From Swiss-Prot:
Subcellular location per the Swiss-Prot or TrEMBL entry: Cell membrane
Topological type in the membrane: Multi-pass membrane protein
Recorded superkingdom: Bacteria
Keyword list, A-Z: Cell membrane, Membrane, Transmembrane, Transmembrane helix
Regions that span the bilayer: 29-49, 52-72, 93-113, 117-137
Protein name per its UniProtKB record: Uncharacterized protein YxjN
Cellular component terms per the entry's GO annotation: plasma membrane
Length: 157
């Protein structure tokens, strides 16, 4: 499998975007996983979930994604910005490494599994559940940190 330069550009953009400090918007934390869920559900054929193997693999990959997302969510730095008073978040080095490992495993799955195998087809189709679980769990952790920080924040007028 030849690595194109686009993959390296995407990896660099992911690293830079995770290190950038952003304002946490609680409404956006809910909308993004819902849009991703809609995209994942729209990409499947209705007959896909009739096989127990496909349902089991999809469930396992969703659990793996949730576990990775909770790990990433625990590593994200969330604070109240001293100048603006807004809640901001910034990714840590550990969360960047975990995202890169997940992306590498997704790209390597095609070379590790033979294409004629039913397990290969089920895993490739279910790979969408890993980012769905990761983003959902990360956003849950961000929302919990946001609520914790804003609950103790007192507005002085």
């Amino acid at each position: 499998m030849a690595m194109s330069p686009y993959i390296f550009i995407v990896l660099i953009l992911i690293i830079l975007s995770m290190y950038r400090e952003r304002t946490v918007k609680p409404g956006k934390l809910l909308i993004i996983p819902l849009l991703l869920l809609w995209g994942v559900s729209a990409s499947f054929q209705p007959a896909y979930f009739h096989s127990v193997l496909h349902v089991a693999i999809s469930g396992i990959l969703l659990l793996i994604g949730l576990a990775c997302g909770f790990g990433i969510g625990k590593m994200v730095n969330v604070r109240i910005h001293p100048e603006t008073g807004k809640v901001t978040s910034r990714g840590s080095l550990g969360s960047v490494i975990l995202i890169l490992v997940i992306l590498s495993l997704r790209m390597a799955a095609r070379t590790w599994l033979p294409e004629s195998n039913e397990m290969f087809i089920a895993i490739i189709h279910s790979m969408f559940f890993v980012p769905l679980g990761t983003i959902t769990a990360r956003n849950i952790m961000l929302y919990k940190a946001y609520r914790r920080l804003t609950a103790g924040k007192v507005s002085i007028q």
